[in-house]
């Protein structure tokens, strides 16, 4: 499940769902590989602006040109995104940021990742999630082969 409850600022809980594990959809080894690949996007690729000091972050950026009414693609109209999770060792939050026609930046790595970072930092702080990475963001992980 993706949502187990909805909590409002006034403390009201709107929905509670039972967690029911049905089946494993990916092999453990596949999950490990995908985590490394998605972490690499944040450490060395287009998702660098999603880095959070002290926390491992993994995710994928996205950029798409919108269709033009005249046919083909509209050159200056984009949908950009970043979907990521943190902390890597024991993920607590999965966040999807989608921006329709961002005003200034037209790539997921420049427009959506800072929004992800701000939301994730707020959630990690609000829920008291302890850091899972050393304070230094540039770890030896970037040298690992994927």
Where are the predicted features?
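Short, highly charged C-terminal tails/helix-capping segments
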Residues: 130-146
